[in-house]
Structure formats: C-alpha cells, structure tokens
Design a protein with these regions (language model features):
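Recognition helix of helix-turn-helix/homeodomain-like DNA-binding domains
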Residues: 31-49, 73
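Short, charged recognition helix plus adjacent turn
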Residues: 2, 16, 68-80
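Residues in the helix-turn-helix
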Residues: 27, 38-39, 66
Length: 80
C-alpha cells in the first residue's frame, strides 16, 4: 500500500483538476457517484479508495486519467 506522502500527492492532483474543471467537492462527488469523504478536506487522516480514484478519473469534466491522478503519469508509455 502506498504511503501517506503518495496519497497526499493523489489528493493534490485531484484537487488541482477539480479546480480546473470548476467543480466543488460536492459536485465532483455527485458526478463520480461517490460519497463525500474526509479526505476531501485535505487532512491526511484518510485517502480516496482506488475505486474512488477510478470513478473521479471517469468524470468527463476532470479531463484526466487514473494513471495521472494516482501516479502522476502523463505519458502512458511510462506504464510499461
């Protein structure tokens, strides 16, 4: 399992994309079909589940991929 520092980076990437999309946390959660979570506050007491990260990446307004949100990968060839 990833350490807290890497989950903090996941939060930062999700938050940046959310802001770019002009969405509130409530709107993002609704569009992704997930519940509001304490991790959305930015406090390192919890983190999104893998399933939540996948669902957030699938929100069209986010214009991103799971690989970017989870690992910061922008070039999918880096996955090989």
């Amino acid at each position: 399992m990833a350490n807290n520092a890497s989950w903090n980076n996941v939060y930062k990437r999700i938050n940046a994309k959310r802001k770019e999309a002009g969405l509130t946390w409530n709107q993002l959660a609704s569009k992704a079909g997930i519940k509001m979570g304490s991790w959305m506050t930015g406090l390192p007491i919890s983190h999104p589940t893998e399933e939540e990260v996948h669902k957030i990446a699938d929100v069209p307004e986010m214009n991103t991929t799971y690989a970017y949100l989870r690992y910061g990968i922008t070039d999918l060839s880096e996955l090989n």
